């Protein structure tokens, strides 16, 4: 992989800039957009970016930082899932707290936004409080977003309890978008102002990158990633008017800026120092780019990856036709084809050959995997194991220079697992998935040195690219993610079964 981003330079520049911003206030409320941990989108489009860069940045500032986590009551009530981890938002709050503590960061509290006594949310509040975590309940803000006089009054932000904080930087984060981070920050500004404290607000949003051209693939990749939110990158007209400089922001921030500026001015009783939405941001990621061509190519690959993901989401019913059509338009805008992703054609060609040989109507499930040396291997589904498991076994054999003829896993281990699935669990599909095969491999490695050598090659798969001709099961998708493999799928189910495809 060609490196296009200097992680150390970015960390230095970013931490310095945040500290400069906080110098103007007694306290800075810093709204953190995107992912604090495991930001694989940023890692993919900025080769060299550390997926945990943001949390390492906060760790560097830990003496000055405390964290408030927001979650929208409605998201808890309807069990909203965080797609990259496959866990509900309430569980992700617990995960966030544990992970933040690992980095020695103080978690001040959890804020339940737009709370109206929802039963499942009340249970979650009880769970947190009984584990010693402070919880604040915020209602919907009366008058929001247009009636500024009501918003900035005792009927608006004044209805919310004040969150007691002690450190100069308060990071406000959440499991996902629409969790009420901005409202929480502004509510705190209102209460701080009432107490005579000089508090400020800033936003840390990695994408779009404000000092990279509007139609740069890096910024278009952000549109592809947020196609379901209908985010559109735009030139910041407010910044142009104020400074005669071209910067990029996204539609929601630009559209909400006039109201946001008025709210801040009403709270502070003075003119805002911010002349544009770009001014509000503290993002310095653009200054870490050291090879623009590498970033462009990586971003184009991410656009294709997002196109496939949206296609599968549409097939599953998670995305509407408009969203899928928009992802197609983004592909066309950058003049990209599905087959510009190297692993797509080998997977489809292998699948077509198998279909001709078996004379079946259904698409043959095949997974193609590109290794770091450019070698592309394939794996097909069989009665023994599925395509994802097969390609992983083929890959570690190749990396360990083990002949195809040699079995890594003894039938003595495989047969009892298959019997357990068929006879005890009464499962219809008894072929082993990726996790089951790797578990069997780890057992074999205890007595088989060849299996042990192959096992040791698994870390080399991190960062590899894969493509499947059919939608992978949730189990395989999760396992490949844990291995650090970026996988895409054609939007086809492996069979006509409705329930047994999951």
From Swiss-Prot:
InterPro entries: DUF1846, DUF1846_C, DUF1846_N. Transmembrane segments: none annotated. It comes from the Bacteria. HAMAP family: UPF0371 (MF_01567). Belongs to the UPF0371 family. This is UPF0371 protein CLL_A2797.
